Design a protein with these regions (language model features):
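Alpha/propeptide regions of enzymes that mature by internal proteolysis
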Residues: 1-193
Length: 193
């Protein structure tokens, strides 16, 4: 199949990706944010679905997606112990862009996924702050870094380095081209498993 222009999830119109990476002697962690639309996504919800293969994760927001079939917030990725912080930051971001949330409308369902980066990162430091999420949102762009960045900073894969990757393909259906994009956070098996 033919690749998209950038071979990236951002080949899908409107999608941007941003990172905030924390790197030091003991910290290898971060936040990756997928902004799925330039519009107010709360007012202009996108059709969405989810499928869980590994039910061990602590992802937030998937139940409402499965129930209603829509996405109404950015999607963020981080480490396991930072899900709550990142979730609250996304709520604050959404409240800042839509003044009707919780007043004239219902509340907002934000989506945060995680992986345990404790093999390479001092996860107990709980170093991620709301400001790191806002920085990742500010950094969102069509062209974005891949590899050991953002939420991929502390990822490992069979004792090799994991990270963030992306790709896209063009598919033709009924003589019309469609772009399929993907963003992956590669993290498989820790050294002690």
């Amino acid at each position: 199949m033919k690749k998209g222009k950038h071979n990236s999830i951002t080949d899908v119109k409107g999608i941007r990706v941003g990172h905030c990476t924390l790197e030091s002697e003991h910290l290898h962690t971060g936040v990756t944010v997928v902004l799925p639309s330039h519009d107010n996504i709360f007012q202009n919800k996108l059709i969405a679905a989810s499928h869980v293969i590994n039910g061990f994760g602590k992802t937030t927001g998937l139940l409402q997606i499965n129930e209603l079939g829509t996405l109404e917030s950015p999607i963020a990725l981080t480490n396991t112990l930072s899900v709550g912080t990142v979730q609250q930051a996304l709520v604050q971001y959404m409240l800042s862009i839509d003044k009707t949330i919780g007043k004239e409308t219902g509340t907002v369902n934000v989506v945060v996924g995680e992986c345990n980066d404790g093999y390479l990162n001092d996860i107990r430091a709980c170093a991620i702050t709301q400001q790191h999420v806002f920085e990742a949102i500010q950094n969102a762009n069509i062209i974005f870094e891949q590899g050991s960045v953002g939420a991929g900073s502390g990822m490992s894969c069979f004792e090799m380095k994991g990270g963030i990757g992306s790709g896209s393909r063009i598919v033709t259906l009924n003589q019309k081209d469609y772009t399929i994009g993907i963003l992956v956070q590669v993290h498989v098996l820790w050294h002690w498993i």
